[in-house]
Amino acid sequence: MYETFYHNLPNGVQIVHRLTSSPVVYVGIMIGAGTRHEQPEENGMAHYIEHCLFKGTEHYTARQIINHIEGIGGEINAYTTKEETTFYAATLSNHFRTTLHLLADMVLRPTFNKKETDKEVTVILDEIESYNDSPSELIYDDFENMIFEGSSLAMPILGTKKTLRRISKSPQYPLNWMAQHYRPERMVLFVQGNVSTKQVITAAEKELLASSPYRPIDYSPSPIAYSPSPIAYSRTYKRHTHQTHVMLGSHTYPIGHPKQLTMFLLNNILGGGSMSSRLYLSLREKYGLVYNIDSQAVPLSDTGYWNIYLACEPQHKDQCLDLCHKELKQLRDTRLTATQLQRALRQLEGQLAISAENQENNALAMAKQMLYHHRAPQWQETFAKVQKITPEQLQEVANEVFAPEKIYTLLYD
């Protein structure tokens, strides 16, 4: 395992640094501000800001941002989720300092040049159209809208054409939103690579402390809480698609919940992306009804959900749903044997180890753990906890989460 170091700046910015021998350093800033922190009339703001921060800062034009990173052979990227916005780059470690300066300038000193941001509005509008043309992607948004109905979690990350045009009218809209949500105490600086902790802290103090326009103030955002409806339901949308797209799922546990890891293992057994998962073996291998099928468990800060997604010929949708429910019932009614559990654990251990070879994913996962847990355990520590899970605990969670009355179903037919 690599050494991991932690430090907090006086203004509240958390720093996590993982020292590796790689010549490549991943450096980024994750902010605990995403779609669920928006009001309905400003939906899409977090994602809009993510785009606009590439369009110019006090020290860099839009072209200079890209040229600076690509000129040293690096890569820069960003993404928005329901709860976070992240900006990060990968460069050779000797360019760490200038890369952090660029990222900090983007996050702390954007200019929102109207000419540049208007171009980005067109780009995002096209992104919305593209998303609407992809049922395999759109169904995830519609499912979240369904399962989190009445909550800000139901809103799409991209926003709508109407809200995007509204929030892009004046630079003051995004600047005001950033002043409220891009707080230092909601930021994580993450660094992974062959640079010293002293270098990281010294650079962070210069870029994120002394130069930060966001000072700690008496600001207490309202706590975000979501209570799901006790009654699940089904919904069907008419879409002009060759296949029927199906998604079903229910609410699960939030980040840090004692049963979160049990749900993680249970989902891996059910349909977690391998060809030996129960759903894949049944619907693909045994019956040949789908090309692909998988499930995922998504923990959030105060809630969570899991879902199964598949696409099939319209005449097979009922059989596919029946087979999905059959596998869920099997997990509710029948405990795993010791042999089955050990096989599931061996499989998960290998998956975690292989996944850990992806340094980019490691760095991003480390940042998210730091944001919510204030520490970043490595995969070996996580797996050590998973190994303690019993068949009884798996069955208990299956009965809580997979209960028929709790399962929402969405179809594009």
Question: Where on the chain are the PLM-derived regions?
Answer:
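N- or domain-start disorder-to-order transition segments that initiate the globular core
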Residues: 1-24
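Short, solvent-exposed loop/turn segments at the edges of secondary structure
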Residues: 22-24, 82, 184, 241-245, ...
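M16/MPP (pitrilysin/insulinase) zinc-metallopeptidase core fold and M16-derived inactive scaffolds
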Residues: 21, 28-90, 156, 273-289
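His/Glu-based metal-binding/catalytic segments typifying zinc-dependent metallopeptidases
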Residues: 19-21, 28-30, 216-277
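Charge-rich, well-structured scaffold segments of protease-associated domains
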Residues: 8, 65-227, 253-254, 271, ...
